[in-house]
Amino acid sequence: KSNEITAIPRLLDRIHLEGAVVTIDAAARRTAIVQALRAAGADYVLAVKRNQPTLHREVKAAFDEAERGVFTPAAEDRCETVEHNGGRRERRTCTVLGGPGLCAWVADPKTWPDLRSLIRVQAERIGPRGPRQRSVRYYISSCPVDAEALLDLVRGHWGVENGLHRTLDVQFREDDCRLHRGYAPAVMAILRRAALNMVKTFQQQFAPDVSMGLLRDRIGRQPWILAPILA
């Protein structure tokens, strides 16, 4: 039986990662994965969630105490972005703290090798009529203290996650699936992603101006048109 914790180390052995920055959600809290990333020459950006109570508490405390003036971090950077989309305004503020003393105090260097940055991303969303929504997320990283670059990495991670899930739901109605027993949910998830990859590949090579929905329907009626990408 496999999950992210067991699958990620096997995947890392097959990928050339030197010089890359890997962003992984909370599953990567396992130290073996982080150590494998550093051994492969890759940097990491890892989400810190409440299911990691000690680390979450220490990272949050570092930002709270820095704001109160309890200490002055050796390195600090901040950036802010404001976006308007469909009548909704979203403001993101990324604050990054660093310094070897601070990082060693927050997290054991043996557990989180080469930790260099503590990251806080505060988001505020205001809709045209809805209530104001606020969220705060924390991350740790081996990357240098650079708020703009780290915010781009964090947003890139969630862009991939949200984009994939939205496409699977809209085009393949994943959220409406009522299979919950045995291996059926996992099998259907694999089939949906395989189908999505085939449609995307066909779209990129032969029909870049045709929407995903139209291509999906056409392939459903004429599956043989996929032959060039399956050969």
Protein language model annotation of sequence segments:
Residues 72, 167-231:
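A short, flexible helix-boundary coil/loop motif
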Residues 13-16, 36-39, 111, 128-132:
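Solvent-exposed alpha-helices and their adjacent loops that cap or buttress functional pockets
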Residues 8, 21-29, 44, 139, ...:
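Short, conserved catalytic/metal-binding motifs centered on acidic residues
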Residues 140, 144-178:
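Short amphipathic alpha-helical "interface-anchor" segments enriched in bulky aromatics
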Residues 31-49:
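A short alpha/beta connector and helix-capping loop motif
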Residues 13, 42, 64, 68, ...:
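Generic secondary-structure signature for well-ordered alpha-helical cores
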Residues 49-156:
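An anionic, glycine-rich sequence signature occurring as long contiguous blocks
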Residues 1-24, 29-32, 205, 209, ...:
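Conserved, well-structured functional cores that handle cations and Mg-NTP chemistry
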